[in-house]
Amino acid sequence: MNDIIQRLKSDGFEGFISVENLMQSRKMISSYSGVYIILRLKDSEPEFLEQGTGGFFKKKEPRNPNVSIAELRDNWVTNEAIIYIGKATSLKSRLGSYLRFGEGKFATHWGGRYIWQLKDSRELLVCWKETDENPRVVEEEMIAQFKKEHGGKRPFANLQD
């Protein structure tokens, strides 16, 4: 699965930093618009948590980010390193919000929340790519390509196209 890093680097992605390290410092992340990918490079089956580390979405009417283990299993794409594709008008801001959510804090980042029910979520790698194009369009194209290669399945934590 490590050849995925070389493929992504050749496509302009950079970073490849663990969630754990990015939670400590996000200085190296660009403020530019772009797309980002969360990778799990382990070949082993994932261990899912009943209660993940994700925070609750919105302070006024908090929503529980956790779903059943069965739902997580249903969404898992076997033998695939890419587990989430996201978009950002500011990579630093969006990834910051995503990581704060993963630390159990209130955040405005509901997408990709299944990540935080993985026991090894802090070991996952994050990479990103700046783009002059509309990040949402780039994200949609990337998800469409992923689905084409995986029998119609989205990356594990992508709940919409």
PLM regions with names:
Residues E50-Q51, E103-F106, F156:
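Alpha-helix boundary/interfacial micro-motifs
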